[in-house]
C-alpha cells in the first residue's frame, strides 16, 4: 500500500476517534538508500489524540500493509509530545536519515531512549523512516506542499484516465506557485504516477491553495479521496557541502571545481564530465580564486533520461568553474543540477600577422612564430575569443527527471542567475 494513502487513512481514523489532525507530513529521506520505496517517503500525522489510542490506530493501519513482500517492512513510532518538542537527538537523526544511511538498530535504541512507542512489521527497517518523520518538524524549516488525490479502489492497478490537456492548462495558470506538474518539452504530466499505486495525481508547489486549485481543475476519472501534505520535497535538504576528495557513496553533495576535460557522450546517451577539486593558492595571499587541485578528480554524469539537460553539460569546456549537485554512487556524481560559476572565454590560437593578416607559422621549437611573407614575429600564441552556448548561472534537469527532494530552480533562493527548465 502507498505510504501516503496509509497516512491519510490513519488521519481519518484519528478524526473518527475524536482527535484533531493538525497536519500530514510527507518527508523524503535519502534517495540513495537501497532498501526503500520508490520515493523513500516517511509520513507523520500531527494530532492531539491520546498517545495510547493513536498507537492502537497505528497498529490497525500497519495491519493493512502487504507484509508478504520481502521489501515491505513498515514501522510506526508514536511520540507523546509536540512535533517541535522532540529531543535534539531525534531531530538530528532526521537530518542524518536524509543525508546518509541509517540502520534500524540505531533508530530502535533512539526511539526507546526517548520513550516513544514503536511498532514494526517484517525486519523492522520501517522504524528508521518512522522515527525520521517524528523528528522532521523540529529538524527542518523549508516546507512545500503536495495535494494528492486517490483512485477508487476497484481501479487500482489499471490505466489512469486523466486528461493531459487539462493538466497542462491548470499547470500553466498557476506556475510558478505550482511546479513540476508537467514536463513541457515532452508534454508528459509528471504529476500522474506510472506505478500501480492508489494515487491518481499529486500536485506540488509552494502554495497549498494553488496546489488544490490545480488538482480541482484536472479532468478525468473520479477522485475517491484527497489530502494535502506538508513536505520537504523540492528543498534540496539532501545536499551537503563537500569537496572532490571528501565525497562518499550513498550521499548527495554540492561540490565546486573546474572542468578538466571535454564532456563525453557514451553508450546509451549518457554524458560524462570530470572536474578537479580546488585548493587555495598556497603562499599567495593575493590569489583571487582557488586553483585546481591536480590530484583530486570527480566524474559526473548526466544520464540519458535527463534529456535536454545533457546539452547544457555538453556545452562545458575545460577550465570552466562549476558547482555540481547530486548523489554519489560508485564514485560518480549523478547530476541533478549545476552552476556555471565562470566560463572560459578565450582559447590559445596561432597569431595572425598584423601587416599581412595571414596566419603565422612556427619559427621552430621555443622560437615563437613568424610571418612567411614579411618576417614579422610573435613570441607565442594569442588568446582568441570564443563563443559559448552557455551563460553563467544554474541549470537543472527537466521535471520528468527530477527527484522528489530536489529543488526546482523556479523556487528561487539560489546564489546566481537561474535558467529554469519546465
Spell out what each predicted region is.
Residues 25-27, 382-422:
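Long, charge-rich boundary regions
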Residues 54, 58, 62, 68-253:
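Long, hydrophobic alpha/beta structural blocks
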Residues 229-231, 353-356, 371-374:
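Short cysteine-rich clusters marking metal-coordination/redox-active sites
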Residues 249-269, 349:
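Structural detector for short beta-strands of small beta-barrel domains
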Residues 252-261, 314-330, 338:
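OB-fold and OB-like beta-barrel modules that bind single-stranded nucleic acids
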Residues 262-306:
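OB-fold (S1/OB) nucleic-acid-binding surfaces
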Residues 321, 327-354:
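OB-fold/S1-family single-stranded nucleic acid-binding modules
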Residues 365-377:
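Cysteine-rich micro-motifs
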Amino acid at each position: 500500500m502507498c505510504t501516503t494513502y496509509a497516512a491519510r487513512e490513519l488521519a481519518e481514523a484519528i478524526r473518527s476517534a475524536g482527535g484533531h489532525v493538525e497536519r500530514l507530513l510527507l518527508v523524503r529521506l535519502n534517495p540513495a538508500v537501497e532498501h526503500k520505496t520508490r520515493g523513500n517517503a516517511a509520513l507523520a500525522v500531527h494530532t492531539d489524540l491520546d498517545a495510547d489510542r493513536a498507537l492502537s490506530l497505528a497498529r490497525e493501519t500497519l495491519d493493512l500493509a502487504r507484509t508478504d513482500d520481502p521489501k515491505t517492512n513498515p514501522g510506526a513510532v508514536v511520540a507523546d509530545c509536540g512535533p517541535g518538542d522532540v529531543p535534539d537527538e531525534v531531530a538530528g537523526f532526521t537530518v542524518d536519515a536524509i543525508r546518509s544511511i541509517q540502520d534500524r538498530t540505531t533508530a530502535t535504541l533512539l526511539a526507546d531512549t526517548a520513550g516513544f512507542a514503536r511498532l514494526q512489521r517484517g525486519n523492522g527497517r520501517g522504524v528508521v523512516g518512522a522515527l525520521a518523520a517524528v523528528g522532521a518538524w523540529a529538524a527542518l524549516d523549508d516546507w512545500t506542499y503536495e495535494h494528492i488525490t486517490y483512485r477508487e479502489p476497484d481501479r487500482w492497478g489499471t490505466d489512469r484516465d486523466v486528461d493531459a490537456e487539462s493538466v497542462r492548462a491548470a499547470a500553466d495558470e498557476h506556475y510558478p506557485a505550482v511546479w513540476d506538474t508537467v514536463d513541457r518539452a515532452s508534454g508528459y504530466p509528471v504529476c500522474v504516477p506510472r506505478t500501480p499505486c492508489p494515487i491518481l495525481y499529486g500536485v506540488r508547489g509552494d502554495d497549498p491553495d494553488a496546489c488544490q486549485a490545480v488538482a480541482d481543475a484536472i479532468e478525468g476519472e473520479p477522485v475517491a479521496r484527497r489530502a494535502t501534505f506538508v513536505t520537504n520535497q523540492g528543498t534540496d535538504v539532501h545536499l551537503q557541502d563537500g569537496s572532490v576528495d571528501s565525497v562518499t557513496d550513498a550521499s548527495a553533495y554540492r561540490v565546486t571545481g573546474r572542468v578538466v576535460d571535454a564532456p563525453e557522450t557514451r553508450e546509451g546517451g549518457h554524458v560524462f564530465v570530470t572536474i578537479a577539486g580546488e585548493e587555495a593558492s598556497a603562499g599567495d595571499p593575493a590569489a583571487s580564486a582557488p586553483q585546481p587541485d591536480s590530484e583530486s578528480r570527480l566524474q559526473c554524469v548526466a544520464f540519458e533520461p535527463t534529456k535536454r539537460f545533457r546539452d547544457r553539460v555538453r556545452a562545458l569546456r575545460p577550465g570552466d568553474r562549476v558547482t555540481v549537485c547530486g548523489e554519489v554512487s560508485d564514485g560518480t556524481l549523478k547530476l541533478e543540477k549545476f552552476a556555471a560559476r565562470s566560463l572560459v572565454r578565450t582559447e590559445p590560437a596561432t597569431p595572425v600577422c598584423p601587416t599581412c593578416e595571414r596566419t603565422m607559422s612556427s619559427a621552430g621549437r621555443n622560437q615563437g612564430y613568424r610571418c612567411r611573407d614579411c618576417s614579422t614575429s610573435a613570441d607565442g600564441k594569442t588568446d582568441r575569443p570564443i563563443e559559448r552556448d552557455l551563460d553563467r548561472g544554474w541549470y537543472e534537469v527537466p521535471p520528468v527527471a527530477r527527484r522528489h527532494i530536489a529543488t526546482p530552480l523556479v523556487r528561487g533562493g539560489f546564489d546566481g542567475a537561474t535558467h529554469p527548465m519546465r
